[in-house]
């Protein structure tokens, strides 16, 4: 018995004879990339596939204030060297042409007033991540980006016609098959992105954590959960 079902939502989003860009991941990079693509190519059909709620991590970043970028280190090469393995991992022309100042200018031009704090972190003047989230969501809607949630790109391959053949899962045993002209994988640290890249023939470097939590059994520290503070830690 074939349990695969053809869904009509994606077909409706892709108009006849229009080129299609599928963005895997509805985080900051995915939504921002989708907006940029739609801005540069208004006739391009842009669809973002996200399993959960778009920009959910943006909403909680920076303690709920959303740390946008760094305002003290504006040179792209220098900035990369301050990230763990950044001098090796940040590659490609995009990082060289779109740095912190470009990011700050974009948000300022779209109504989000920013401030640079003493340590270089850039936050919205509102001190509320919703300013950034609302801006991105509003611009995505204005430009015509389609955000499709509750879906996962289960597999990717190259079709005989040279397009990206994608298998998109909405529910268990409920799939839709789509061919896209372009594919942007912006799934962050999710294993999904690494899996899709490998399926398309890319070689991968095993990921290692740069930001992680400590699991401490001491119940006295439970009340400190979620509290952030500047400190010097020696390991």
Regions found by a protein language model. Give the residues of each.
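Predominantly flavin-linked oxidoreductase catalytic cores and closely associated redox partners
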Residues: 130-131, 135-235
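Short glycine/serine/threonine-rich phosphate/pyrophosphate-binding segments
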Residues: 30-33, 187
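Hydrophobic anchor at the start of a short beta-strand
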Residues: 44-46, 114, 183, 204
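Beta1/beta-strand and adjacent pyrophosphate-binding region of the FAD-binding site
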Residues: 14-29, 47
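Glycine-rich FAD pyrophosphate-binding loop
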Residues: 22, 38-63
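Cofactor-binding loop segments of dinucleotide-utilizing enzymes, especially the Rossmann-like FAD-
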Residues: 26, 51, 209
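A short, basic/flexible loop-to-alpha-helix module at the beginning of a structural domain
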Residues: 3-18, 174
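Conserved N-terminal/central alpha/beta ligand/cofactor-binding core
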Residues: 51, 56-143, 151
């Amino acid at each position: 018995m074939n349990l695969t079902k053809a869904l009509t939502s994606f077909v409706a989003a892709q108009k006849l004879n229009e080129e299609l860009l599928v963005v895997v991941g509805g985080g900051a990079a995915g939504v921002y990339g989708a907006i940029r693509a739609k801005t540069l190519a208004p006739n391009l059909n842009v669809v973002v596939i996200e399993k959960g709620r778009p920009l959910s991590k943006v909403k909680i970043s920076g303690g709920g204030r959303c740390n946008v970028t760094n305002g003290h280190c504006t040179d792209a090469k220098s900035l990369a060297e301050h990230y763990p393995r950044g001098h090796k991992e940040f590659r490609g022309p995009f990082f060289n042409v779109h740095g912190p100042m470009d990011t700050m200018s974009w948000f300022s031009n779209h109504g989000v007033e920013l401030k640079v704090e003493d340590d270089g972190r850039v936050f919205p003047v509102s001190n509320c991540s919703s300013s950034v989230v609302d801006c991105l969501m509003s611009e995505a809607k204005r430009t015509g980006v389609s955000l499709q949630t509750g879906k996962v790109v289960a597999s990717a391959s190259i079709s005989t016609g040279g397009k990206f053949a994608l298998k998109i899962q909405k529910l268990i045993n409920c799939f839709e098959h789509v061919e896209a002209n372009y594919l942007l994988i912006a799934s962050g640290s999710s294993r999904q992105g690494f899996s899709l890249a490998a399926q398309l023939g890319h070689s991968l470097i095993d990921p290692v954590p740069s930001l992680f939590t400590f699991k401490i059994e001491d119940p006295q520290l439970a009340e400190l959960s979620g509290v952030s503070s500047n400190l010097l830690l020696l390991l």
